[in-house]
Each structure stands twice: as structure tokens, then as C-alpha cells.
Amino acid sequence: MRLDEIKIQNFRKHSELIFSPSEGINLIFGPNGSGKTNILEAIHYCALTKGFNRTTDRQCMNFSAESFLLKSLFTSDTGCQYRVHVDFSTNGGKSISLNNSQLEKFSALIGLIPCILFSPAEITIVHGSPQERRRFLDNALCQISKSYLEQLLQYRRILQQRNALLHSSWDRSSPAPDMNIWTELLAESGAFIIKERMDFLDEFQPYFSNAYAILDTGEIPRLTYRSSLGKALVSSDRAGIADSLMHRFGEIQHQEQVRKQTLLGPHRDEILFYLDGSDVKKYASQGQTRTFLIALKVALQRFLFDKKGEQSIFLLDDIFSELDQRRVERVLEMIAGFGQSLITSTEKTGLSFLHEISIHDMLYKHGDPL
């Protein structure tokens, strides 16, 4: 997959901009505040229907504007073209069209244009709450599997309904009459998600170990899935996981009634990161953490390709400030010749094979091609 062109109107710092990257590695450089990251975010919007760091659509509008418009053209590895338009206004909300047909569900776009982001803010994947690591896992799986995306959305709907029942029955001595129905639905959907997540980590581990070995030496990385079932998870097949969930829900029924929320399921699971057996979140240095994160993303690029048969667009925001030059060059060596990458930086010096990279200077006139 590659981005041929994106036209940006009233998005973040850009009142009007046309950006046409080359195939391979593209370097977007310019001073801080020039809008480099905003270009990557606009591309991310068109590929995955949302911006960075869970920002709202309204926050992405240019100052004093009442709307923004993104028009993009992508071409797949097989030559199929996808025209994606994202239109947002304070009055009309957000609409997304694909090849001139408006999407009823934005989720229909997910996975069509594989896209991977690395940015300094994503350090929360390592240091943040378990929700951040679950989100990393879910974002990857949703780009691979439509079934997973549909089950994840369904699980969230069921969870919301079950929590509403728990909240409304706080003054009852017994569960709401239809609670068991929602519990069974939640267990079935939750078992699917847990199984897919565990299988993903098992398959992804060799890709990640290889990427980390290229970027660093000696340390052995490991990814581990920790279910909220704990020792109650006695089976790794879907039916067994669902049975374990149902049994455990029965055991914690009173606790859930007291706390008025669902205390068990994939929405409470954790992914643990280790280096040589030590918890990365607790013991890794800043350099180790950054290397761990970029290795995750580079490995994901290869993994998505093997799963989908389509190369991903790789967005790397301010990578030069996050890694030393040796690791930066190793990252570039790994992604060179493997799909399209777009990198932002405040400088363009210090790279041994800079001649192999397309340079885009942010010192442009608004409305002119970059």
C-alpha cells in the first residue's frame, strides 16, 4: 500500500496543503511547529478513521475554522486505488467516503489501508495503563481480521448493556432476570477475543524477537498475555475459555453487584513486556524502552505483510530524537525497500544513506505541493 497524494484543508496547522510522497522512505523535515506531525496524523485519519492519541475531531480543526477536509488517494500492492475523503464540520459531524461512496460504518475502512504509527507519545504502550497495551493489541488485530473487529465492537456493546444492568440492580438481593443471558453472550464474545489475542502473541513473538535482535544485542524480549481469569483459565480453546468465564462469573456475582461493574473479561486483561525476564515497565532504561517500542512497530510491519499480503504505510514521528544514530540507521535499513515510510524530523543530516531517501522540506507556500 502507498499514499499517492493527500489534500489537507483546515486540519491542525494547515489551512491548505497538498502532499505527494514518493515510494520508499520519505523524510519530512522542518522546524518545530511547522506541522510535520499534522501531515502524518491526516494520513492516519484517512487510513484508520481517527487521529493520534484519542484526540477528538473538533480538536483537529484549524484555529478559527468550523470544518476540515482530507482527500487522499492510495494504491494497493496489486494496483487497486482507494480514494478516501474525511469531512468534518461542527454542524454536520464526520463523514467518510470510499471511492465516492459514503460509509455507513467507519469500521468498514479498518484493515483496507494497513497503517502503523510510531511516535514519542506511544511510550504509553510500555509505561501506561493496561488499557494502552490492550489498545495496541486490538489495533493490530483489527487491521488483520474483520471478524476480530466485529467481535470487539460486539463485546463492547454487550459489556455496556451488562454494566447498565449491574448498575440498575444495585438495590436488589439477586441479579436482574436477564443478567444470565448477557453474561453468556459476554463470555462467548470474550472467549473469542482472548483466544485471538493469545494466538496473535504466539505468532508475533518470533517477528518481535528478530526485530529487537537487529536493533540491540544480548537481551531477550518476551510478550506475555495475562488474563483476568488468572489460574481459572485452564483451557486455551474458545469453548474452554468461555466455560471458565461463566464459572468465574458465578463465583464473583456478589462482588459485581456491590461494585456495579463487570470485573472479568478481556477488557480487564493485561499484556506484559519482559527483557531477560525483567518487567520492562518497571526496570527498563529509557533507551531500552524506546528500542522495545520501535521493535514492536517494525515487527508489526513484517507481521501484517505476512498476514495480509499487503505492505503497510509506516508513519514514524520524530524518530531521530527518540533513538541514537546507530539504531536509527538500523531501523531505516530494516524498512528500506519494504513499503512506504514517512518520517518527520527537525533535521536531515547525519544519515549515511540519505541519498536513498526522498526529502520534503516544510518551508513551502500553503496550497502548493510539498
UniProtKB/Swiss-Prot annotation:
GO cellular component: cytoplasm
InterPro entries: DNA-binding_RecF, DNA-binding_RecF_CS, P-loop_NTPase, RecF/RecN/SMC_N, RecF_2
Entry keyword set: ATP-binding, Cytoplasm, DNA damage, DNA repair, DNA replication, DNA-binding, Nucleotide-binding, SOS response
GO MF annotations in UniProt: ATP binding; single-stranded DNA binding
Keyword ATP-binding annotated: yes
Cleaved signal peptide residues: none
Domain of life, per lineage: Bacteria
Physiological role: The RecF protein is involved in DNA metabolism; it is required for DNA replication and normal SOS inducibility. RecF binds preferentially to single-stranded, linear DNA. It also seems to bind ATP.
PANTHER family, sorted: DNA REPLICATION AND REPAIR PROTEIN RECF (PTHR32182:SF0)
Family under the similarity heading: Belongs to the RecF family.
Name of the protein this chain belongs to: DNA replication and repair protein RecF
Gene from which this protein is expressed: recF
